A protein has these predicted regions:
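Short acidic catalytic loops
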Residues: 1-4
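C-terminal regions of RecA-like/P-loop NTPase motor modules
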Residues: 6-12, 20-30, 41-124
Length: 124
């Protein structure tokens, strides 16, 4: 199936249809699906650049059907003087069957890898 935006079919509605088809497929095959989305530029105008669910670009339906939404924030991207170099925040912004929250992890950009911080770093 092809998802194409046309005069009758906007990009947002094509993404919405795609989101619902992914959900149906996951249920049918009894699998988990990871969907990666681009953020819109709304956060660029905010003082706090941490992403929010409302920042998901043209993909409100993806957020709607998702069981969990994890957003990634790296302070060093927006703040040259950041003391959090190599640290990322994984923001569990939506969790249908549990709590939401933030986990701080080590980020290795050269291989796009996340790792747990050492135990002593948890208390910072």
């Amino acid at each position: 199936k092809t998802y194409v935006a046309s005069s009758q079919h906007t990009r947002a509605s094509a993404l919405g249809e795609f989101a619902y088809d992914l959900k149906r497929l996951a249920k049918e095959l009894e699998i988990h699906i990871v969907c990666i989305c681009q953020l819109n530029r709304a956060l660029e105008g905010r003082a706090d650049k941490r992403p929010m669910l409302s920042d998901l670009k043209e993909s409100g339906d993806l957020e709607q059907v998702a069981y969990k939404c994890i957003l990634i924030y790296r302070d060093e991207v927006y703040n040259e003087a950041s003391e959090d170099e190599g640290i990322a925040e994984l923001i569990l912004a939506k969790n249908r069957r549990g709590e939401t929250g933030v986990a701080r992890v080590r980020f290795y950009g050269e291989c796009t890898q996340f790792q747990n911080l050492k135990q002593e770093s948890y208390n910072e």
